[in-house]
């Protein structure tokens, strides 16, 4: 499939590149075809792919039960595993047809997906911005996710790294491999998107901002989202998640604070953000 069917130069350049790189390993490449900046995602099966698939299924089963323990819903592992390049291409086409700001799909095949280049990732912009500029970026990211949710959609990969901004200021959501939207109820899936967004800010690498600013940026993200999308069902799911986090922090907080690492410390930031933003409930 190609939306550049009438662009012979684009098709020729793409075909030549795919032929030249037919044996390339799994990965992502940034390539320009006939003046069009593109992102090429490739998947190459290997002899040990069945083993990887088995480990992946085991991981998904564990995550499914963990989701049930923390959020009250157990998503189907089979649905969560609908996350190959073809699945992503189909989701992107549906979202694009519905008017969402997602990359155009130039071409897709079982092991190849070619998308339009969407711009610079949000984490880079956050690191380069002034403190005031970062607050503005938090408001922008929160508003973009709120708009996406109000339209009835779920991202499933709502980390800040998957929000791109082009030179003209257009924001585009990328990376729709995960099938969270079909595996969970809509309110919980959207609440999970919010959690991913805030958690990604909590764990964002960078020496440009200190602990207090990081916590403030997390709070700005959540407050901005709740102000732009005051959906009571999504809020109720966030409150439920906060209660589970509070229990974990109550009994294990003393231990977690002593463990270094972005993931653990990010959990504490998110727990504090949810508590402070939802404390009026």
Predicted feature locations:
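Short beta-strand micro-motifs within the conserved protein kinase catalytic domain, predominantly
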Residues: 103-112
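C-lobe/activation-segment region of protein kinase-like
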Residues: 166, 176-280
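ATP-binding glycine-rich loop module of kinase domains
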Residues: 27-83
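Conserved short submotifs of the Hanks-type protein kinase catalytic core
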Residues: 111-122
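Juxta-kinase regulatory segment immediately upstream of eukaryotic protein kinase catalytic domains
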Residues: 1-30
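Short, glycine/acidic-enriched loop or turn micro-motifs at the edges of active sites
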Residues: 119, 160, 178
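Conserved kinase catalytic-core helix
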Residues: 86-102, 123-161, 194
């Amino acid at each position: 499939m190609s939306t550049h069917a009438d662009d012979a130069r684009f098709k020729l350049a793409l075909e030549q590149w795919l032929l030249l790189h037919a044996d390339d390993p799994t990965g992502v490449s940034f390539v320009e075809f006939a003046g069009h900046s593109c992102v090429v995602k490739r998947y190459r099966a290997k002899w040990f792919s069945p083993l990887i698939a088995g480990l992946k299924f085991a991981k998904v089963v564990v995550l499914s039960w963990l989701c049930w323990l923390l959020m009250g819903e157990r998503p189907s592992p089979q649905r969560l595993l609908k996350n190959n390049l073809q699945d992503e291409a189909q989701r992107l086409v549906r979202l694009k047809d519905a008017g969402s700001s997602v990359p155009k799909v130039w071409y897709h095949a079982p092991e190849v997906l070619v998308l339009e280049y969407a711009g610079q990732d949000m984490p880079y912009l956050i690191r380069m911005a002034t403190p005031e500029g970062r607050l503005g970026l938090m408001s922008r990211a929160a508003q973009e996710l709120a708009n996406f949710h109000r339209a009835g959609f779920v991202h499933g990969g709502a980390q800040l790294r998957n929000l791109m901004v082009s030179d003209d200021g257009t924001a585009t959501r990328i990376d729709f491999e995960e099938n969270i939207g079909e595996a969970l109820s809509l309110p919980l899936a959207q609440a999970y998107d919010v959690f991913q967004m805030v958690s990604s800010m909590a764990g964002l690498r960078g020496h440009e901002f200190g602990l207090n600013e990081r916590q403030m940026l997390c709070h700005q993200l959540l407050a901005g989202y709740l102000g732009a999308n005051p959906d009571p069902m999504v809020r109720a799911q966030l409150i439920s998640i906060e209660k589970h986090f509070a229990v974990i922090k109550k009994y294990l907080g003393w231990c977690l604070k002593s463990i270094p690492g972005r993931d653990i410390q990010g959990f504490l930031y998110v727990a504090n953000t949810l508590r402070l933003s939802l404390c009026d409930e």
